[in-house]
């Protein structure tokens, strides 16, 4: 599914994240200027993505459920600011009709301060909180990921799962996620 990252100093990033909101639901912000201005940006871009332009954002809030899974064409780097649980699975387990059996999901505790690489073929979505104060998670992806599509997709095959740039999403029908494949 991924690996724990070594050789990064996330101290400044974690400190800056203390200024981000932790709502009662979940918020995702793909790119945050204050996070991208930190020294760690160069390390993440060069060591983590081989020099590709990246964005640093966050996913924060309170969550106790799996209502969707997504994947990208590249790894995602997460830094747990608080303890959190990731619910993850394998892209290869998506059925030909683009459904996914959630009984195959596994839960992993990511301790606060830990940086991880979530491989491109790993299904994931918003973390679950461990403590009543909610969760805070840094999200690093290639620049433009999870932003609005600027082109039309044919809503057939795998393209029917694309809801944003570099984002393929399968949602539970009760989640009512706009544009998602249910």
PLM regions and their residue ranges:
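Active-site region of the double-stranded beta-helix
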Residues: 1-112, 126-182
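Histidine-centered metal-chelating micro-motifs
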Residues: 114-116, 121-125
């Amino acid at each position: 599914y991924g690996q724990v990252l070594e050789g990064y100093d996330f101290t400044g990033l974690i400190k800056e994240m203390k200024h981000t909101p932790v709502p009662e639901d979940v918020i995702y912000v793909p790119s945050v200027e204050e996070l991208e201005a930190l020294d760690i940006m160069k390390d993440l871009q060069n060591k983590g993505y081989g020099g590709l332009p990246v964005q640093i954002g966050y996913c924060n809030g309170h969550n106790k459920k799996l209502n969707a899974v997504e994947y990208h064409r590249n790894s995602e780097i997460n830094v747990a600011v608080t303890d959190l649980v990731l619910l993850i699975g394998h892209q290869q387990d998506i059925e030909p009709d683009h459904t996914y059996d959630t009984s195959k999901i596994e839960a992993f505790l990511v301790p606060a301060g830990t940086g991880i690489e979530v491989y491109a073929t790993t299904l994931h979505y918003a973390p679950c909180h461990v403590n009543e104060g909610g969760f805070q998670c840094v999200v690093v992806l290639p620049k433009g990921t999870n932003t609005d599509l600027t082109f039309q997709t044919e809503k057939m095959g795998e393209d029917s799962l694309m809801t944003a740039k570099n984002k393929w999403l399968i949602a539970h029908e009760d989640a009512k996620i706009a544009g998602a494949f249910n």
